[in-house]
Regions:
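Proline-centered turn/helix-capping motifs that create local helix->coil transitions or kinks
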Residues: 10, 108-116, 324, 362
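Second-shell residues forming the walls of enzyme active-site clefts
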Residues: 1-96, 103
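A short alpha-helix capping/helix-coil boundary motif
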Residues: 15-18, 40-41, 61-63, 117-118, ...
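Conserved, charged catalytic cores of large soluble enzymes
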Residues: 81, 95-102, 106-124
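C-terminal non-catalytic regions of proteins with extracellular/luminal or membrane-system context
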Residues: 3-4, 26-29, 45, 51-54, ...
Length: 425
């Protein structure tokens, strides 16, 4: 469940791998021989170098080196303090250090000889191939959660006036500004994406701060798109003990939308039957308090440089949504583990996420793997071929609707009557 997507990155030639902060099987991930050597090196054949996540991923420097962690980031805190003494007293072999240095030098020399320019111009960043990848990523990830009375897709011939509401409706919003920050050559906002999609229509933008005015605009439009959610200062990298940046980034203070977004949705509810809410965020957002007030909801996540264009394509049916929820949208905060945005240590038990909710029969609003489409599919009964250590499970998928689309085939496995405590699926 957790390793295949990392394995695919290695198979595609990833040159470095970062260890995480969390523990796996009781060990720090950045000090785990099982992860860093047994799986990454021996099983997958990785030949690049490994580095730790920043500041707190490594606790025991010598153990990390022996386990296959080559570089401590962002400074050599534990390595500088602990490694010389460990070599001196014989608890760390010089061969382990040499091995780590070897992986680093080999990777650096390989890329140095390729003369990578390091600075990338528009013809590289915004080349047709990169734009196509950005569009595909957004197209396949957006999730259509609700489409009451088939509000979507909107009719191009009948849509002459669209109102985009919300602070994020015309904000270039691609997510975290920490180590995962990217610098695309351009970013298309929802408002600009709709303007490009419908050049002959009247497209209006309003941040929604004046609820009465927003309501008037919504009532007079053929369709309303409310863009709600988060930006990097709401959820991103954050140091819990840094008072000078308290309140910026890190874990969200709430699992719900900002009150301004909730007020906007409540404020315009009922005035336009063609209202769509596009939600931007990285993980589960509770929507139960307003979900019934709007006919259509799309989880857009942080959809990258082409996000606004893709949202417009989905709204007007040029792209058929096929994304599925990578988490469960619960009915309340009580369905999740205790939540403390300022904690420096948290322990999650074996069951969390959708596995916990399944195990405890907790009702949810939208389950893990949920996502609507503009078409319908028929999936045949599976056929199973059992081999020595593997099994091949096959199904036939048929598009039974009138719209070209794609379906994500999901396979869940359970162990009924198992003597070992296991997830339901």
């Amino acid at each position: 469940v957790y390793l295949p997507h990392f394995k695919r990155c290695i198979e595609e030639g990833a040159a470095s791998v970062m260890g995480a902060y969390n523990k796996v099987y009781g060990e720090q991930a950045s000090e785990s021989k099982y992860l860093l050597k047994d799986i990454l090196r021996d099983k997958w054949g990785f030949e690049g170098f490994t580095l730790s996540d920043f500041l707190w991923a490594v606790k025991d420097g010598p153990k990390a080196v022996k386990s296959g962690m080559n570089v401590e980031m962002p400074c050599i805190c534990h390595y500088a303090e602990q490694i010389p003494k460990a070599i001196e007293d014989g608890t760390l072999a010089m061969e382990d250090v040499d091995e780590a240095v070897g992986y680093i030098l080999r990777t650096v020399l390989y890329y140095e000889t390729r003369k990578d320019p390091q600075e990338y111009t528009e013809d590289i960043l915004a080349c047709p191939e990169h734009i196509a990848v950005a569009k595909r990523a957004a197209e396949e990830s957006m999730v259509l959660l609700k489409n009451e009375n088939h509000v979507l897709p909107l009719d191009k011939e009948k849509t002459e006036k669209i109102v985009v509401l919300g602070v994020l409706g015309d904000t270039e919003n691609i997510g975290d500004h920490g180590s995962s920050k990217v610098h695309p050559y351009y970013t298309v906002t929802p408002f600009k994406g709709l303007m490009k999609k419908m050049p002959k229509a009247q497209i209006l933008y309003n941040d929604g701060s004046d609820l009465e005015h927003a309501k008037e605009l919504a009532a007079d439009a053929d369709a309303v798109v409310i863009v709600a959610g988060y930006i990097h200062s709401d959820e991103g990298e954050y140091l819990a003990d840094r008072s000078d940046i308290a309140g910026m980034g890190g874990d969200r203070a709430s699992m719900r939308l900002h009150q301004r977004d909730i007020d906007l949705i409540h404020g315009v509810k009922g005035v336009n039957p063609n209202t769509v809410v596009s939600i931007i965020g990285s993980s589960a957002i509770l929507i139960d308090e307003w979900e019934k007030d709007v006919p259509a909801i799309i989880f857009s996540f942080y959809s990258g440089m082409e996000g606004g264009n893709v949202l417009a394509d989905i709204l007007f049916g040029d792209v058929c949504p096929s994304g599925k929820l990578p988490y469960t949208v619960a009915l309340s905060e009580d369905s999740y583990p205790d939540f403390d945005p300022d904690c420096t240590y948290a322990e999650y038990e074996y069951y969390h996420g959708y596995c916990k909710m399944d195990k405890e029969n907790i009702p949810v609003l939208y389950p893990f793997g949920y996502g609507l489409s503009y078409t319908t599919f028929d999936i045949s009964e599976p056929t199973v071929e059992v081999f020595d250590k593997t099994a091949k499970i096959s199904v036939n998928v048929k598009n039974t609707g009138d719209v070209k689309g794609a379906e994500v085939v999901q396979l869940y496995i359970g162990c009924e009557g198992s003597a070992v405590d296991r997830p339901v699926k």
